[in-house]
């Protein structure tokens, strides 16, 4: 049985969650926390399998609640939204960066009745996320700026584009990478991040405010610029048109994913061939693997996040198992490798896979 702790001050959300769970013998709502502080305390005392935290536009800081849970009693956390996602984008981005696994919509009601497909999706997501192994986080110490490193001389032909695919745990991993890449990166970065609709604008805004690179949601036909990060919009496929422009389309899902990492990797492979670099980050499932086949056949390079630093090792494991990855790296080493490869230098050392 999955034991759920709900953190909400909203009677409406409490009622929706209770009604969704009451008909499922494999799920139990153990208690309701009325504040972030209560949620942290109850998590340590009750040891639930998962904590569902309401995304609040006011009051307690949702991100701080997640952060404190990860420090005091590491437990899978999902954020629940029952409002317009566009109003909560920045808040959700901070919560995901703090360690929340996903933002999911609360079960939807039609009149007095809950919609059965919404109940099933809600419960299946809660159960899947409750199985994720999370690790304790530590309070960050203030550190001085790192001294700039001398760049090794150019040793190889540089790449022209970077594609990144991520799912569960991705927002925090993406931020960890982008904060360590300087604004003068000579190539653009395109990112597919699986998440609920309505939150990608907030993620882009949050990243743009906290990392050296320019971060935005991709627009069809936009010119590719170096040092710029483009995030796939909701329910759209992201790729390139030739070597100079973005292509944002309503093309069909690839293996159920839209946006899809495989779609992105295949698109950049066709345009940039051996001058493309793909990075597969933490996430459930196997998105990205199919696209890596095309990218590797075109001569491109691929990096996968290692198991220890992944929240969920599904996507990287699939890519590694298929023999499509050049380097398997801990999260903290990926930015350095992207920068080195983009500048045409020999890659910093990592675990090599061929």
Curated annotation (Swiss-Prot):
CDD domains: CheB_Rec (cd16432), REC_CheB-like (cd17541). The active site is at residues 167, 194, 287. InterPro entries: CheB-like (IPR008248), CheB_C (IPR035909), CheY-like_superfamily (IPR011006), Sig_transdc_resp-reg_Me-estase (IPR000673), Sig_transdc_resp-reg_receiver (IPR001789). Residues 3-121 form the Response regulatory domain. One of its GO terms (biological process) is chemotaxis. GO terms for molecular function: phosphorelay response regulator activity; protein-glutamate methylesterase activity; protein-glutamine glutaminase activity. R.meliloti does not have a group 2 operon. This is Protein-glutamate methylesterase/protein-glutamine glutaminase of group 3 operon. It comes from Rhizobium meliloti (strain 1021). The gene is cheB3.
